[in-house]
Curated annotation (Swiss-Prot):
The gene is TPS10. The Asp-Asp-Xaa-Xaa-Asp/Glu (DDXXD/E) motif is important for the catalytic activity, presumably through binding to Mg(2+). One of its GO terms (cellular component) is cytoplasm. This is (E)-beta-farnesene synthase. Monomer.
Amino acid sequence: MDATAFHPSLWGDFFVKYKPPTAPKRGHMTERAELLKEEVRKTLKAAANQITNALDLIITLQRLGLDHHYENEISELLRFVYSSSDYDDKDLYVVSLRFYLLRKHGHCVSSDVFTSFKDEEGNFVVDDTKCLLSLYNAAYVRTHGEKVLDEAITFTRRQLEASLLDPLEPALADEVHLTLQTPLFRRLRILEAINYIPIYGKEAGRNEAILELAKLNFNLAQLIYCEELKEVTLWWKQLNVETNLSFIRDRIVECHFWMTGACCEPQYSLSRVIATKMTALITVLDDMMDTYSTTEEAMLLAEAIYRWEENAAELLPRYMKDFYLYLLKTIDSCGDELGPNRSFRTFYLKEMLKVLVRGSSQEIKWRNENYVPKTISEHLEHSGPTVGAFQVACSSFVGMGDSITKESFEWLLTYPELAKSLMNISRLLNDTASTKREQNAGQHVSTVQCYMLKHGTTMDEACEKIKELTEDSWKDMMELYLTPTEHPKLIAQTIVDFARTADYMYKETDGFTFSHTIKDMIAKLFVDPISLF
């Protein structure tokens, strides 16, 4: 057994007792928020007469985390924007924002609109910081073959970095820093609200009703998140991780943070709870099979999961047996929570876990045989499912409404191309962030190491190549996102949101494993309310 020393939980049972200081004001905040929602709705309807105002208002509501209150109004406005030519096509800010919002909402618009902003030598002609930001963000909803958007990213990034050398207005400087760190399309929506509320509060043209509603909306959501954290922490404590599973990553709060990053709206509370539990259980499986167990023990656990029956626990060593039985019990309890009309969905939780375990077994076999996949594609075919991202995304669908049908789950079980793009993005990001740690722990060959061995490169060179492949996978995802299907758009939107969480968690390091790197942001999301004044 090769047990890697993971740091202990940073939160323990903190959320069992914690209540945000805003809790006593919940009733008043709810009443005030309802009044403001209608006031903002009137503002949104009034903006329909002018495309630029409509675009500005939509992007503001999205960034402040308010757009889910106005889904129908925003969809109607964007249909009008899509069909109308009544806008200034010489204004790069407007053209970029229009392009970004339409693509984000699934409308197919051509990137050729940006060629008119280049001179005879093919260089972009723009030096206004606001326009640069808009173009940079628009370029990241690119697909394959859109050379003009690839060039726009290179150009605008260089210009934005240079702009920080000159004095900028505080709100604009904050925007540039935020954008260079992560383009708008890839940011977690709930964290974007936390970051953008203070920026919006500095803007001269801010709408005070929208600003107040954004603060109330976040504080009310935070109360719901804390209730969920109490529930999942108490559930997690029953496993007695510190004593029985001391070798695993004890990360229940981080699991919930991850799920909230992908499904932040209040109506998805059950979805977050189920997905958080599944993420925690998948983490235990991963650490058992990848890091701690012997090959024989790992294969016994895999066999027990294939069988999915209590009697199979007799196959297992003591430290696996209790976990296995708790896994079965948890899936059964999820069925009870879902009720008779939706309990069938737990079948798909089981099937997704079996796929995960099958892939992990293959990786163990590779490790034991010192086998290196011949290509990155071969590697991803097996290692994509084992990163767990798609299983977690599917577990979030289990707790969602009736728009997610049995046919939806059957389709997801075929691992459609959109699912593969999520798995590839997550695996490549994970490997880039985790390679050095896992190499030292004697684990299976990552995509980074696979590339190094096949091409004779350094680790840094291989990481750069893997980053290029990650960008290609984002382009794959965008193309598939824009392709109409018979399945609810919510599925594609949520899968993209899970890709965003992977980008956040693995941007600089493995933030899930080394969770002190995200502790401050977890506190901002779950512990610290936003001041109304």
